Amino acid sequence: KIGASITNKKSIEAANKIFQNFVNIDELQKIASKRISKCFKTESAVITASAAGGLTESVASMMTGNNLDNVYQLPNTKNMKDRVLIQKGHLTNYGAEVSQGILLSGAKILSCGLKKYCTNEIFENTLSKNKNKISCAMYVVSHHCSDYNAISISDFIKICKKHKIPSIIDAASEEYMEDFFRIGADVAIFSAHKFMGSLTAGILAGKKKYIKNIYLQNLGIGRGMKVGKEAIYAAIIGVENWYKRDWKKEIENQNKILKYWLNYLSKERFNGITYEVIADPTGNKINRLRIHVDQKKSNFTIQSLSYHLEKNKPAIFVRDDLIHLNHFELDTCNLKKGQETIVMTEFKKIIAKLKSKEIKHNINQKEYSNKSKKEWLNWLN
């Protein structure tokens, strides 16, 4: 919705520089592979148009191998191993369904366990029984996924290695890229435009033999997901800049914002509003402010607060993934200096309007979800 992170200056400079030149894309991708894999401490890397596109291309590559006839044949998977093994709790939605990203390649999904339950035994038994059909297994690292009674990423990789099944890790929103290769991931997928603040692109890294086959997809279904020279070069600079950053200073800045918000809310004492600082669910070095709304005390719903913050001018977008549980989060990431005060000023204005019923105060979860769908359907109307 908000165009990813704010692009860092060095990535912008890199894009502007290469815009003015012709390049050999194959050679540029080789440079990207060499420089990015060095940062990630793995064998190889390739840049794709997006992490979502990279997911589809990585699955495709596991079916085709280095057989160009197979590459040309997709999404027809005749005579290929075309099953992707994944925990049911990892078939989530990140704006689109993970399942759809897999199916776009022509592959079929082989899910195991329940939405909130999968053991090592269930995963391994499913793998063993279907080994002659499975091309790869996928693990999604995301706050969207259920990690309750799910198998761990380390166990997932160990089981895959035991049965010689390639592993794909979807870690689009993670900041510790090298950790996945340290524990043995064959391929991992990252976003260049999230934490690293580069141009929109996917970064796929891992074992050289798999990365080479991913690159071959540009001759097939990957053609519709091709990446430009500017995103490739900006991703190189974005990754290298990420590993040079002063992360201690970043954490200090985040904590200052959180402290300001906590002090502001403590002074205002909004009726029915409670709050707490929470850590990032997947272990990134980020803390966020979680806002709870008690409708009986506040006389408005949390869905109403979120909706009107977004429709406000200036718009305030919150992390509303778990709003059905009666809370949302305020994120410190990427805020420019002084914007933390704007967030609280507008927060106060919207609450006042909700309390006076100047704006709709009783939006429920169903209405909230439907409003978003209607806006998509009414685009350009």
What are these regions (language model features)?
Residues 266-363:
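Conserved C-terminal alpha-helix-loop-beta "cap" of PLP-dependent enzymes
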Residues 1-26, 32:
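Glycine-rich phosphate-binding segment of PLP-dependent enzymes
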Residues 15-16, 33, 59, 262, ...:
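A generic alpha-helix structural signal
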Residues 16-18, 43-49, 83-87, 292, ...:
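Short glycine-rich or small-residue beta-strand-to-loop segments that form or flank ligand, phosphate
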Residues 1, 34, 43, 127, ...:
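N-terminal charge/polar-biased segments
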Residues 22, 144-146, 336-337:
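Short strand->helix junction
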Residues 1-6, 30-48, 52-247, 257, ...:
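Conserved PLP-enzyme active-site core in the AAT-like
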